[in-house]
Structure formats: C-alpha cells, structure tokens
Amino acid sequence: LAEHYGNPVSWLDGKQWDSVMNYDAFMEPITWFLTGMEKHSDDFRQDMIGNTSAFWGSMIYNATAFSYPSAAVAMNELSNHDHSRFLTRTNHKVGRTNTLGPEAADEDVNKAVMREAVVMQMTWPGAPTIYNGDEAGVCGFTDPDNRRTYPWGHEDRQMIDLHKHLIRIHKENPEIRDGSLRGIFEDYNVLVYARFNTEEQTLVCVNNNPQPVTRQIKVWEVGIPKETVLIQIFSTDEQGFSTEQTEVPVVAGKMEITIPATGTLILKHGKAQAEDDEKAEKSPIRNRRWNFVKFS
C-alpha cells in the first residue's frame, strides 16, 4: 500500500501496489463536503460545503482508478501525518502553525461535523483507517503540528466511544464491508446513500445543515421491500450520539425521516426484518461489487 498523489491507475494493475492512501476518492471529497476546507487547511471554499453534486462527481470520477480489490482495501483516512487533523478543519481556519500558532488549531472546532465524518468513514467502501489520536479528539495543523502526542488522561471519551460503536457496526454488517454503494438522495447539505447486497441493506443519512431536515426517501431501488420496517441503529447530533433503536416504516417504497441538525442516521433492513415481513419481495438487485451508482 502506497502514499501517492495523483491518479494511481498505472500502479494498480495487480503487479505493483495493492492500493493507496485514498486521498482523491475519500479524504478530499468528504473534507470539502463537510468542511469546505482543503486537506492541508490551506484554503476554504464556502461553495463546497454541502455541495452534494461536487461530492458525488469527485467520488465517482476518482473511483474509476480503482479495481474492486484495490478499492476494498484503500486506506480511507480523515487525517494523517501529512495533513491537518480533520477536527481542526471543522473550524474553517486557513493557515498553518507558522502563521496562526498551534493554539488556533484547537479553537472553534465542531465535533458534530467530526462525528458526521466518522460515520461516513466507517460506512464507505474501503478500509477505514484511524490516524492515531483522531479517536481521542486530537487537533493540529499540517505537519509537524498534526503529529502531537496522544492526550493520555485528557482523551475525549465520547469520541472514543463513538469510534468503538461505529467500528462494531462496520464489522457486524457484511453489506458495509463489501457490498454495493448507491446514492439514493441528495439535496443541499443532505446526503443519503445505501450499502447493500442481495440480503441486507444499510442506509446512511447525513445532514450537514445547522437545523433538522425531514425528507421522503425512495428506498425500494436497493432491494428494500416496498412495505416493511427499517431499524434505526445509530444516530448522531450536535450533542453526541445514540445507539437507541427505533422503527422507521416504509410505505409504497418510501420512508420519511428527520435527520438531526449536523447529524446522521444509520438504518438497517436485514434478514430478521425480511423474515418477519409477510409482504417482503425477493430482491431483484444483484450484488454488484464497487457498484458506484449515483441516482436513477
């Protein structure tokens, strides 16, 4: 696995590298979408925050460099040794330690946006990779400031617990690890995508607006029966996160949901729901691995 800037396609022919640090088809699109920041904190663009069209365009275009095996093990990082910490990017401060000072990296950060990013990291195709300290709330500008020591005794315990729960969700749901990906709804600052295989589906809903949003979402296109119940298994908001489970009905192939302000929802339709639903139809969707489908 290599660190590479630019299109890696010539290196991913099966004879050289297995995969790369996934800047172009993960770190950069998610950073622009959620924070409007360049990954070194060298630029801020208001027009990129919540720009779902730019997000999907970048993701799909850059994913074409990967074969499925390379995509499945691509190192999906939010931060690393060469770039500012993702949590620092949430404060929209343009600069580095030599211009702003290290203290500025910790100022006005938005942990709710960080939680959104971790939810996406743990549910996106590839290998979620945590840069040491991200899970504990470490901040920092581009190196060397991003290489701060681990904050022993001063960790953000809620952020650590968030990572633990999301890692468990990643491990326990095969459709998240190696299923297909499809975007099923987009709006300004609102993104809904599905990870699915022939038997199970997980929906991830992201709202980067500072207020809750309620939307009707078509879900039948990813193999979810038109009359069934989804289980909300995880959520985040401006205060933290919740693992409380609630039922969300699907009527005529659509669900109505309210996504918290600067928050996320993860919803699941699995074997248990299909078995309990007398009206469940056999899914017509085949498992097309690394199937980057946008919107029908």
Regions found by a protein language model. Give the residues of each.
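Carbohydrate-interacting/catalytic domains
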Residues: 110-111, 123-130, 134-296
